[in-house]
């Protein structure tokens, strides 16, 4: 049996992206289930017009939607985004059944694909649409390079592809998304040296501060985590800036792909609750999370030939106990 084909989670960061989060309207399961299989064809049709634009999309499914769309087992760690409240800072959990992470060299093909996907899905409601852009040399609007710690090569595969721990979903991964809005007035009031202590890296040349100079509540310090054997645990981030000058909106769209949902969740807990508790991420004094959703990113093979819809209780023969419906469900 050939190895499962992952979606393009590890595609290089592009200058343009659209992050589209939708919910499935009541009764829309069949249309959405059918529409998922059409997405690859849409990418080919639109991307064929100009292959140099490197159009791609990664499609991911939320916890509640999974049970509405597919029969059989479900990914072992799939659950709704865990809201966090550390008293001083809060990470909300917001609705989302499907996430479409659309990337290309230019926004025109991203926009065309987003329109086509929503039309193909049919009875869905867009609950969040964010247009991201590359800012100089992959910097965020705070002025720092973003994504420096991303693994590459085999390490990236290991960080983002489920293996024998959940064989039914090998090659897939989990993805967390959050929108952060930045208080640019407060941020720009800091000196460059103060900003560097908040982040844990130098601003101009993107060098990690020495441990002696890096505060325990710096963003970098709280996002470097190890397993029980001392091995650093990695995720792959494809964060992008977004904003609207007229509305005073300046933000970062956080999107983190991981083999284990627990890795990203530990990083977020360190930021919002603190490690130790109370030592929260200093960047949250300037950046506020306004959304939070979690999804599972299946393989391309899964999307091309998904399991059938679950059998609704109203469709079962009279007297059926539906014992088989317990298979693969968390107990």
Q: Predicted regions: what is each one?
A:
Residues 1-330:
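Long, histidine/aromatic-enriched segments associated with O2/redox biology
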């Amino acid at each position: 049996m050939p190895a499962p084909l992952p979606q393009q989670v590890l595609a290089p960061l592009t200058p343009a992206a659209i992050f589209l989060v939708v919910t499935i309207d009541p009764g829309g399961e069949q249309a959405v289930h059918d529409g998922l299989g059409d997405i690859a064809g849409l990418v080919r049709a639109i991307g064929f017009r100009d292959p140099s634009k490197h159009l791609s999309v990664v499609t991911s499914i939320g916890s509640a939607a999974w049970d509405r769309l597919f029969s059989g087992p479900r990914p072992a760690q799939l659950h709704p985004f865990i809201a966090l409240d550390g008293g001083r800072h809060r990470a909300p959990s917001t609705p989302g059944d499907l996430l479409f992470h659309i990337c290309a060299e230019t926004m025109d093909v991203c926009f065309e694909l987003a329109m086509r996907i929503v039309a193909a899905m049919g009875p869905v409601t867009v609950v969040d649409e964010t247009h991201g852009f590359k800012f100089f040399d992959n910097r965020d609007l705070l002025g720092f390079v973003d994504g420096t710690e991303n693994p590459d090569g085999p390490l990236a595969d290991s960080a983002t592809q489920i293996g024998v721990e959940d064989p039914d979903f090998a090659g897939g991964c989990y993805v967390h998304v959050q929108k952060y809005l930045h208080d640019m007035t407060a941020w720009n009031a800091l000196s460059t040296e103060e900003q560097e202590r908040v982040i844990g890296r130098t601003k101009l040349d993107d060098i990690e501060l020495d441990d002696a100079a890096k505060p325990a509540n710096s963003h970098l310090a709280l996002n470097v985590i190890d397993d029980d054997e001392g091995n650093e645990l990695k995720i792959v981030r494809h964060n992008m800036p977004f904003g609207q000058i007229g509305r005073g909106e300046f933000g970062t769209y956080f999107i983190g792909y991981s083999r284990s949902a627990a890795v990203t969740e530990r990083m977020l807990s360190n930021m919002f609750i603190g490690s130790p508790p109370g030592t929260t991420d200093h960047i949250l004094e300037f950046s506020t999370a306004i959304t939070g959703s979690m999804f599972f990113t299946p393989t391309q093979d899964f999307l091309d030939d998904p399991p059938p819809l679950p059998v609704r209780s109203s469709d079962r023969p009279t007297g059926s106990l539906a014992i088989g419906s317990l298979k693969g469900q968390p107990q």
